[in-house]
């Protein structure tokens, strides 16, 4: 059934808004790469399974980073997959380091960049050492903001630095790999770090930024709500407020509310069904559950609807032990 939004937009605008061309190009590439396997099932079934996986959000599993960040839907799907696969970390009350969370991210995306994980951890840890422990919920909501709004935050960081230095507010901000959050943060003793910038002026710049750029931004009304509650704030104070804001989490729509983060009955039922199908696995997990706080390096995975497409990627992901495994988390 077509949504009212679909009917209100011209065809070409709706296709562009939903990034349909991106998925068509990816589907055709996979069709060509796996044509021998697909020929025995049929092209029509392949496209049906591919777009069903896109709708279900499983199409991003074990894919390259350039693909999972290509569209807002891909980013939201990756966030949801990370939560569903590893929420047992939070359910067990385990605290992990930034490197350990990065290992988990690489199980779903082998080439996931360490830099993004570090930025998410910085939102939680602020000025603590990067090897400090973090709860799953704290890291997840910080990671959600950093990953989904990464381009927006690059420009926000550049605006913040310009306000601190008193630069012309009409300067156009172009996010690059060497700008924004990559800039050297002020020393702890600096007045700019302690006092931040004026919230009203900061909001004016952010409002213009949201109007000017097409990439995903938090709803301006919610950003205004955050900034209207303070007179001054720091950059990382702003990121913390974004990560903890209930309305922004709802607007993004990838994760449940914090109170429901550990509950996923559908996933629990599916995992139980999969575990029963593997002889001896349930007894093995029960016997070793107290000896290990981290989930297995090869946890049960939600299979792609089109198995030949992802078989090689799964093998690559399972053989890519690029980071060390932690046997026990600190308490």
Curated annotation (Swiss-Prot):
Keyword Phosphoprotein among record annotations: yes
Start and end residues of each stretch annotated as Required for interaction with PCM1: 1-111
Predominant location: cytoplasm
Compartments (UniProt record): Cytoplasm, Cytoskeleton, Microtubule organizing center, Centrosome, Centriolar satellite; Cytoplasm, Cytoskeleton
Sequence segments annotated as region (Required for interaction with TPGS2): 112-331
Single GO MF descriptor: protein-macromolecule adaptor activity
UniProt feature, compositional bias: Acidic residues: 318-331
Keywords for the protein's UniProt record, in alphabetical order: Cytoplasm, Cytoskeleton, Microtubule, Phosphoprotein
Residue list for modification Phosphoserine: 319
Matches recorded under InterPro entries: CSTPP1
Keyword Phosphoprotein carried by entry: yes
Signal peptide: none
GO terms, biological process: regulation of protein complex stability
One GO cellular component term: cytoplasm
Region (Disordered): 292-331
Ranges for region Required for interaction with TPGS1, LRRC49, and TTLL1: 1-225
Function text: Regulator of the tubulin polyglutamylase complex (TPGC) that controls cytoskeletal organization, nuclear shape, and cilium disassembly by balancing microtubule and actin assembly. Regulates the assembly and stability of the TPGC and thereby modulates polyglutamylation of the microtubule, which antagonizes MAP4 binding.
Family in the record: Belongs to the CSTPP1 family.
Subunit field text: Interacts with PCM1. Interacts with TTLL1, TPGS1, TPGS2 and LRRC49; the interactions link CSTPP1 to the complex TPGC. Binds to alpha-tubulin.
Protein name (record): Centriolar satellite-associated tubulin polyglutamylase complex regulator 1
Lineage: Eukaryota, Metazoa, Chordata, Craniata, Vertebrata
């Amino acid at each position: 059934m077509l949504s009212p939004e679909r009917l209100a937009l011209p065809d070409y605008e709706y296709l562009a808004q939903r990034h349909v061309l991106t998925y068509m190009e990816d589907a055709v590439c996979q069709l060509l790469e796996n044509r021998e396997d697909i020929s025995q099932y049929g092209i029509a079934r392949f496209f049906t399974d591919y777009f069903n996986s896109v709708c279900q959000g499983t199409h991003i599993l074990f894919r390259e980073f350039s693909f999972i960040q290509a569209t807002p839907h891909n980013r939201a799907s990756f966030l949801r997959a990370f939560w569903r696969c590893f929420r047992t970390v939070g359910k067990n009350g385990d605290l992990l380091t930034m490197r350990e969370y990065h290992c988990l991210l690489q199980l779903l995306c082998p080439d996931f960049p360490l830099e993004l994980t570090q930025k998410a951890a910085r939102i939680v840890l602020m000025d603590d050492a990067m090897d400090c422990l973090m709860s799953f919920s704290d890291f997840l909501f910080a990671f959600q903001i950093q990953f989904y709004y990464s381009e927006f935050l690059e420009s926000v960081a550049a605006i913040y630095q310009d306000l601190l230095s008193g630069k012309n507010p009409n300067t156009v901000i172009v996010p690059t790999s060497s700008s924004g959050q990559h800039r050297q943060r002020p020393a702890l003793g600096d007045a700019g770090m302690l006092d931040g910038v004026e919230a009203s002026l900061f909001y004016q710049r952010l409002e213009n930024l949201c109007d000017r750029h097409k990439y995903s931004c938090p709803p301006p009304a919610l950003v205004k709500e955050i900034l209207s509650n303070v007179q001054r704030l720091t950059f990382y104070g702003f990121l913390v407020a974004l990560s903890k804001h209930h309305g922004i989490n709802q607007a993004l729509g990838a994760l449940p509310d914090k109170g429901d983060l550990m509950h996923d009955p559908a996933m629990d039922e599916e995992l139980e069904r999969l575990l029963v199908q593997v002889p001896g696995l349930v007894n093995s997990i029960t016997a070793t559950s107290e000896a290990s706080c981290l989930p297995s390096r090869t946890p049960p995975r939600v299979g792609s609807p089109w198995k030949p497409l992802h078989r090689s990627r799964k093998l690559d992901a399972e053989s890519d032990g690029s980071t060390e495994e932690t046997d026990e988390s600190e308490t």
